[in-house]
Amino acid sequence: MSVEKPVAAGRQNSKATGRHKGWQAKLHMQLECAITGRGMKTVMAELHHYGPLRVQRPFYPEQDTAHIYLLHPPGGVVGGDGLDISITASSQAHGLLTTPGATKFYRSAGQTAHVSQTLTVQAGGTLEWFPQENIFFPGARVQMDTRIDLHGDAHFMGWEISCLGRPVNSEVFHEGKIDARFRISRDRKPLLIERLKVDQPSHLNAASGLRNFPMQAIFVATGSNEELLEQARECIEKQATDMPCGLTLIDDILVMRVLGTRCEKIQALMLPVWQLLRQATLNKPAVIPRIWNT
């Protein structure tokens, strides 16, 4: 494994302007399938990081698949911070990435926090992306871009969960600006383009917006078909949820969208769908990351 030593970096304030310069953090990881003393398994062939972005040593609860925990900056993200994450899964590699807790975006004094997440999966590779929720505090200003680039028969499953305000404290996202994009392409052909843009209270309660729900989530899985779509709908019906939820099929991508008020309920709704599709498309039972149980 090639590791680039991190350069010291921290939040700074300009003496001349008093403005917050923020964290500027980067992380690049490449996953490859390699022969080890215990057979073939996915390893971190490359890992370079700068600033307060880290990963823990991979866990192997299912032998060949690497479970990796991505550690975000301590104390959350504020205006002026910049996070750049780039992860590549090579052919035959299979990685599952998650985070130990929610990522918090705090109130900004005027500057915007920028987050770029580029996930590349080469032909024959598999990547699963299951971070915990993003919590946008009232007054946060965030621009987030998540891009999934697939090649050939690459597989991808993942979700993104967004919470605007802090509903557990009855805090409404009454001010701030969120512009979050989620895009999937295969061989440079765009397949799915999602955008969550909130810069005024009306976006939260509009019928075409969040309908007064503080949380929204999207789950996607490649390699799907009409039969799996119907099975996924049956999974949802069995749970008898009162949360607005919809499933669609775009090419071979199953897309699930959910509105809700509690993250654990949203995750509980999506997990059976993940379990169904993982077994059907990857021929592997879903293994819950251990960190979720702590």
Curated annotation (Swiss-Prot):
Pfam families: UreD
UniProt function note: Required for maturation of urease via the functional incorporation of the urease nickel metallocenter.
HAMAP family (alphabetical): UreD
Gene Ontology MF terms: nickel cation binding
Keyword Chaperone on entry: yes
Protein's name according to its UniProt entry: Urease accessory protein UreD
Family of the protein in this entry: Belongs to the UreD family.
Matching InterPro entries: UreD
Localization (cell): Cytoplasm
Cystine crosslinks: none
Keywords for this protein: Chaperone, Cytoplasm, Nickel insertion
Primary location group: cytoplasm
Statement: the UniProt record of this protein carries the keyword Flavoprotein: no
Cellular component GO terms, alphabetical: cytoplasm
Assembly information from the UniProt record: UreD, UreF and UreG form a complex that acts as a GTP-hydrolysis-dependent molecular chaperone, activating the urease apoprotein by helping to assemble the nickel containing metallocenter of UreC. The UreE protein probably delivers the nickel.
PANTHER family, A to Z: UREASE ACCESSORY PROTEIN D (PTHR33643:SF1)
Domain of life: Bacteria
Region (Disordered): 1-22
